[in-house]
Amino acid sequence: MITTEITKLQYDIYGLLAERRLKDAFGKLALLVNELQDWVSRDKLNEMETSYRYMIQYMLDGVEDPERKSIYDHLVLSAYVLTDRVSDRLAGQVSPSQYYGWKRYASASRTGISLSSQFDVCDNEINDLSLALLLGEQEQDFSKIQSLKHRIEDTAGNLFMGIWTNYPAAEEDYRSLREALFTDRFPDTFVSLLLSAVLLNLLHRFDEQKLLILLDGYRHSSPEIQMRSLCCALIVMYIYRERLPLLKSLRNRLDALCEEPRFKTDVRNIFLQFIKSQETEKITRKMNEELLPEMMKLGPSLYKKIRQEDLMNDINALEENPEWQEMLDKSGITDKLKELTDLQMEGADVFMSTFSHLKSFPFFQSIQNWFLPFNPDHTALSGVLSGKGGDTFKKMISASALLCNSDKYSFCLSLAQVPESQRDLMMGQFSAENAAVQEMEKEELMKKEISRENISNRYIQDLYRFFKLYIRRTEFTDPFAGHINLLHVSVLNPLLSDSDSLRLIGEYYFRRGYYAEALELFERLSAAYHSDSEIYQKIGFCYQKKGDYANALEAFLKAEIISPDNFWTIRRIATCYRNMKKPEMALSYYHRAEKIQPENLSVQMNIGHCYVEQKDYEEALKYYFKVDYLDPEGGKAWRPIAWCSFLVGKKEQAQRYYEKILDDKPVSLDYFNAGHVEFSLGHIRKAIDYYRRSICLLYTSPSPRDRSVS
């Protein structure tokens, strides 16, 4: 059995167990067990099948068993565990992945070395380095210190791999993990790294005890460890959400954590950051496909606007050139930059496109380095951040909340490619005497305490980069491949189901265009807030965005009952009726909207459209002419006036308006319709000329209006 067949069977069984189809799950599990040819697994499966048959038999006989549900849940959980273990052992025999490759290597070359022993080795090396650093600067041996740092980094890397591949774990492994992570035995940066190894281990196969260890990390004294632990735990809980209700110990642990004053707020904030991570791909695409190409096109034009003598004499003249800003405004670059700046202020990941090309350094070939908290004294950065101003630069980049840890390493490693003389010159700008640097030290950027939100946001960005950019990323379960919706994790419902949380998360989804997710929350809110018209408006809008006009109309009508004279609601109701091909009903609501805003051009146009749909062209013309009167230069009503005039036989009037259209910005359909008018007036040659132009424009214009003609 090859790896893909094993994985498919594994996830088929997961699906059956999620639906609680135990008998079918046992049948597929038997295929895996038979392939493994392991008598212990065979006996375990037989035992589960026997218990299941007895339970069914007792139920059919009408025997009341108060323990039936707990027995059933235990069977489901046991089936999950057996599936995990059997599929893991089978994959270990044939899979070429990095995970199983390391397990085979460790088994062959490091037999008998437990996690506990690896922790002891690392502890001793850290103590050796601490002793070496206690010596005065004159007595310190730089090469020895660098050698010790290298050894610690290598040992930490091996330990990371050991924790990642530690499945199935023994009781001693759980004790070692707890002692290492939560007894102040190791530095916080070291513990922070190892938490990511636990996350990767759990994404490979579920382990209840390790999930509880992650949740216990929230009680650590370090905010960095607290937030990293919680991020990891929430990702794991979402991935394995179907089996969590079976774990009583998990529910008890969550109940205890709910007593922590910040736990609920932290969970909610991390959830919002997971939602933000879904924007990263969209932002990257906008940067690469819209902003950067526009700036490249604009570059030569901007250079021409800058007089060479101004450039040479006074660089500040650039800031004073109004034509420069005007060009940026007209090109739309200013708006795009403002949008990206606003997203960055909200914590969105706007640097993914910038740093994705800087992940090919050898540093990132080691899996553990993707999760390292930034350390400017890492041996990979040796000599890069030295010289005058280097210490200040280290402080600045370490404290910066704008870059995640992975991007900070990318930035510093890219500096190593800069010639030393230029790098020293740049570092010199960050000397302590520099007034700008002194000012920055006073600002929040240089504060030692970084907000909890920043910690989790940066860590999520680190995780996102690993799962999207690591060279062997396809071997991992990518939690960011879909949307991490914690509302679908039933054990977290007590934390997220209050009205404030539902409204906050719903508005967050709504603003970002995730209408299906927003709809789910607004409908839950509507059950509690029957008299809130805004909720029904947003429910209707979400349905409308999905193209479900019947349900949208139902929601808008409820909003109308609560706020009968709301202009926005009335217009939406009319729009729904129009899309449902009910122009009579739409017309009645557009007339109501007209009474509220008699000079609203959009309303007047839509009234005209409704009359056209009813084939009342004369009445439609009245409203189109009103629009043309209120906005004579806009030209919004020219096309409907021209076409309706033609339909009612006012050919000369239609001709005049088509001439205005063709003098403005005509599309293929305009020439096509103008040709009809000229043909009806007997101007055959002119009609043929218009038809030819229509065809030419149809195949040369990117306009959707033109393409629709074909």
Listing of model-derived features with the role each one plays in the protein:
Residues 526-527, 557-561, 591-595, 625-629, ...:
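Conserved structural position within tetratricopeptide repeats
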Residues 383-563:
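Alpha-solenoid helical-repeat scaffolds
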Residues 699-706:
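Conserved small/polar residues in nucleotide/adenosyl-binding loops
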